[in-house]
Amino acid sequence: MRYDPSLIEKKWQEFWKEHKSFEADEASDKPKYYVLDMFPYPSGAGLHVGHLIGYTATDIVARYKRAKGYAVLHPMGWDSFGLPAEQYAVRTGTHPRETTQKNIENFRKQLSAMGFSYDEGREFATSDPDYYRWTQKLFLFLYEKGLAYMADMAVNYCPELGTVLSNEEVENGLSVEGGYPVERRMLRQWILRITAYSDQLLEGLEDLDWPENVKQLQRNWIGKSEGALVRFEVNNERFLEVFTTRPDTIGGVSFLVVAPEHPEVNRLISENQREAVESYIRAAQSKSERDRISETKVKTGVFTGTYAKHPVTGADIPIWISDYVILGYGSGVVMGVPAHDERDREFAEAFSLPIYEVLDKDECCIHSNHGDFLLDGLAGQEARDYVIAYLQKKNLGEAKVAYKLRDWLFSRQRYWGEPIPIIHFEDGTCRPLEDDELPLLPPEIQDYRPEGFGQGPLAKVKEWVDIHDTKTNRRGRRETHTMPQWAGSCWYYLRFCDAHNSQAPWSNENERYWMPVDLYIGGAEHAVLHLLYSRFWHRVFYEAGMVSTAEPFKKLINQGLVLATSYRIPGKGYVYPEDAREDNGVWMSASGEELEVRQEKMSKSKLNGVDPQILIDEFGADALRMYAMFSGPLDKNKLWSNQGVSGCRRFLNRFYEMATSASVQDVDDPKGMALAHRLVHRVGEDIEKMSLNTIPSSFMEFINEFVKLDIYPRSALAMVVQALAPIAPHISEELWTVLGYAPGIDAAGWPKVDPKYLEDTSVTFVIQVNGKLRARLDMDKATSKEDVLSLAREAVAKYLEGKEVKKEVFVPNRLVNFVL
């Protein structure tokens, strides 16, 4: 029989759909397993094979766990709010809803062609009103808990995108989305109080089965520091508070530096310095935060004209303003200790400020005593504790813990996002919408461009913004900012537990059954974005008794990048692979220009993405799935090769021919059964360990041995087909029925391995002549003594030729020695 994946794969995909083969059942008395992908943003580019690595891995696990008797929840949905659809709408006038739906249909078609075993009945998009009704409701819950608030703050503003960006959405002064310049501006924003959960978010990491590098990234982002809050008196009327992790260096303070955005700045400026300071602040506001704190940046600053009093010596300390100090961390004021801090030293040297050595080479305090302040000779924690106690006694300081983590800037000046369900009144009060007013839908508009600085496109729709509030009988204005793309992905994993609930975002019963997510797979780029935000929301829900687990994702795996060859004309851009040709070892473009050839992350922008449908049409989805795993360890970067897919197709051809040959018979062959049992055992172990890249090799080794049999035992082949089903499900379903079993291989379960077949039945005999090693022979333990001796004679025949063997020494399973 001929293997034709185009017919087989379509046939079984229709069978699965018709029989709802992958529908999850929370009413089951089975143990549960929840396996989830980080759901994709449905872009216009569609999926390339790099996206399929993680999806294939989760599908293998889902199919395996079903076969092992678990109730499996394996859903897929769409993170469908986002900036690209809105930018496309600005260029073309096409409503983001239309392009998003078109893209979703394309993604759905691509995923379906791969044979992924999703519970399609639970699919949703974050831009569905039935979904974001609950996103809005959950935002209002945060608001009622005091965790959502409005404040004027310095923000990252991108003029090109026309919106504010969070710190996590800016990299090297450019927007992550599009790479456009970002400026700092003051703007009234909605903010989520994630800092209230700093300690819980840190502590929760300890028990998670996550990659250590991801946990460390989150620890660093939260940035817990223990130190002291020190008060410096200014003009005998107010204090500047400084957080420092090194209070033991207080004797070396020679200046203070204040962030340009600090609320006290205006009061600190002397009149003769006002013009210079205000000019400096304007310049600082145009810079991104990352530019300001760059270690390579030359330190700049301006003197305020004002002095603070040193809390120990009473000396006058000049107060400067510099953009290397950021308001959000600590107190927004730095005490300059240039002898023992590199940034402070650079600043002091730039402005000829004094430098006082107060620590020796052993970090022991020196030159710090003053009156009853006796710090010299102390070191480390003892010195820090002494300073804190001294300052506390004088009401000039105390111990304090600070965090780098800042509250989450939540609002965006966009159209294609969840409207924030708040009405503002003229007296400065506001009202959250009630349940019967949700979902709050955005108006239909024609112009998707932002309405000037700080105003999103919604601000232009006056009939939607300016309303008579029937609940209060007052005139009001709707909030015109929208939520960020992260809002919908903060809780989508919970909605999958109860996707059709019209009364609540999820039911307690379903949540208790399915949560937490047992296996979560996605890209490492989400380490301090989605993963931190969703942990924050989940922790709030947990403390409110809305969910049963403190953490949402039990085990996390970050799939590695998929690399492919890219071709680039230096200074101009990338060209398609089909437009590149090699000429005497030099790659040239179709226009005759020399190309730079690299192995880079597969992406649309680099023109090196591979459309999976092309490979499916040529080799079949099962071959593509198999190579997606064979290409390398799941969590490592890997170089893509279409030839590798071809190799997996050849293996499947061979396997199909073997399983459908006349040699398949109902016989009991111990060797064939041993090969099958060992393979099933090895594949099961590899899936449990997520060593998925070794599985294809195991099948290839199996077939090389199995074809040596004269007769292929049907029961052994059936076991192997069951083991192949998670990796190559279409061909496995087909061969399962060819072997005489009822359709629906998942329902047949995972084959039971008999331990007796796992024993090593082969043994290596050492063959000696007069005690000297002459050969080694591998053979089955069950081989008779007579056969072993016969084979041994053949192996060393040249050493025995023409000589008399006086004695044959035989040690079972170990040695044969011919004594001449």
UniProtKB/Swiss-Prot annotation:
CDD domains: Anticodon_Ia_Leu_BEm, LeuRS_core. Coiled coil: none annotated. It is found in: Cytoplasm. A motif ('KMSKS' region) lies at residues 601-605. Keywords: Aminoacyl-tRNA synthetase, ATP-binding, Cytoplasm, Ligase, Nucleotide-binding, Protein biosynthesis. GO terms for cellular component: cytosol. This is Leucine--tRNA ligase. The keyword Ribonucleoprotein does not apply. Transmembrane segments: none annotated. The keyword ATP-binding applies. ATP binds at residue 604. One of its GO terms (biological process) is leucyl-tRNA aminoacylation.
